[in-house]
Amino acid sequence: MENQRRDSRQEAQRLVRARAAFVCMALCAAMVLPARAAAAEEHEIVVERNVAAKMRDGVTLRADVYRPKAEGKYPVLLVRTPYDKRNETNFGLKAAAHGYVVIAQDVRGRFESEGEWYVFKNESQDGYDTVEWAAALPYANGKVGMFGGSYVGATQFLAAIAHPPHLAGICPTVTASNYHDGWTYQGGAFEQWFNESWASGLAENTMRRRAEKKYDPLGGSKVLPLNAYPVLEAPSGEGIAPYFKDWLAHPSFDAYWKELSIEDHYAQIQVPVLSFAAWYDIFLGGSVKNYVRLKTEGGTEAARKGQRLVVSVGGHAGQSSTGKSGAVEFGSKLAMDGDEMTLRWYDWLFKGEANGVEKEKPVKIFVMGKNEWRDEDDWPLARAKNTKYYLHSTGGANGLGSNGALSAVAPAEEKADQYVYDPSDAAPTIGGPLCCGALPTGIGPEDQRPAEARSDVLVYTTPAFAKDTEVTGPVSLDLYVSSSAVDTDFTGMLVDVWPNGFAQNLTSGILRLRYRNSQEKPELANPGETYHITVDLWSTSNVFLAGHKLRLEVSSSNFPRFDRNLNTGEEQARATRIVKATNVIYHDKAHPSALVVPVVP
């Protein structure tokens, strides 16, 4: 495990330096687009490095500027990144040649910019100041747009809620709506693999800045005792990533998180948004929510009517151009030029080009199974019908080969299923939405049969479908549960079972029982008491081809994607004591547990 963690830290450090891991241009490489207008400009380019922008508190942030050499005023595309602005060179050159000023800025406390780095904290204020600074540059025409993914998407939304007057559009990719639920936690469980690997990668630059810090010999000479002379102090781990400890200290949705929640500030967003998401991305839930809620809650008509959503397949680090994601081959249609898509949208929005964008439907999704792109009028699909698949068994749904079943028929009197959840032997993560280090079991769609073979994983499966059956939209799991512990987790996973037995994970979720009623006010459970809970499995789009089966997995862990609930009810960040829990899933007339999926006729 230690070697695995060391490898993951190295991978995380590589990923946070690599533009392809996060920006829109990598993820969106998934679709064939109409060409931009034939009259596309080709400009000679000027590149300026480390251009200073002073924030309102006097801190200087530095940016690289790529712009056309010819005199004139051009729209600005801004990216504010903690991952080193030099990684934006390729797109900067391309967009500048096409008639844009591209500004790539290191955010506060990162790489060439001054100040102290703390995740999310300064992005609204600094984003506002940078947008207005950029709009006032002598070669800017006053229109500023933003682009980029993951945290770089967060810098866009956090700037947008401050509504700087010259911000005219944003293009966020694979980013969240809430930095508590859907980023740091999900359903009350800590997103352990992502946050540990991401924080480790971020810490690399902070440690380097500390190591390179120049000490003042004259000032240092006044320090007592002599052995405390600053130059002798090597950088320590203390203070390298204070935000990580703060995340753990705030497991509930409290004031620490509310200040940063995009969901609580949609009315302050006043610009059109082109959002990119992916079915196997760690931020899928928030990406979709941003689109859905901004349509009705955006602060202006332009914002409400200007929402666009594209959902691809690949995970957080984008997808290969080969059409393969994880263990599944999705075909040659997963080929595209993502830079082209972004520029085409901004050509329409900022330059007024009639390039076809104005005629397109607002939603574009990749439908797995059929492996094709489809345009939609909205999301969720109005024609989709929420369908309940009820859980059935004779009390022995444990593992593959069990008698667990799914049916549209509600249960009568049936024996409950139970299993022992042992945190010291937790059900493992196999593929799925992961970042920012690769697990040996893969990322994205992978074969779930090794997990399904465990006795602490309940398996419920439909008969093989006689005809193609499409599930597209939000998926949820209604369960009636009890536990011998005062706190435990319940997980759910929707799976497509191929005729050869391959079990492809589609989407999944988790709920920490203490957060069954609220993310703000945890309530421990009474052992043995039955509770009705809902586990949000986020969304998917998949056609279960004829001969395939639909499967549900229910368990109490998905480790190390999520932290293990130790079942004690103690503070998770400090707890070490482990208790086994006997967890029960009820499915009878009084407790009709069901998987709810949107079936498209």
PLM regions with names:
Residues 153-164, 479:
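Short glycine-enriched nucleophile-adjacent loop
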Residues 97, 161-268:
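Accessory cap/linker subdomain of secreted extracellular hydrolases
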Residues 40-72, 461-467, 480-481, 521:
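N-terminal cap/lid segment of alpha/beta-hydrolase-fold proteins
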Residues 269, 275-277:
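Short beta-strand/loop motif that positions the catalytic acidic residue
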Residues 138-151:
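Alpha/beta-hydrolase fold nucleophile elbow
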Residues 68-136, 178, 182-186, 190, ...:
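Cap/lid segment of the alpha/beta-hydrolase catalytic domain
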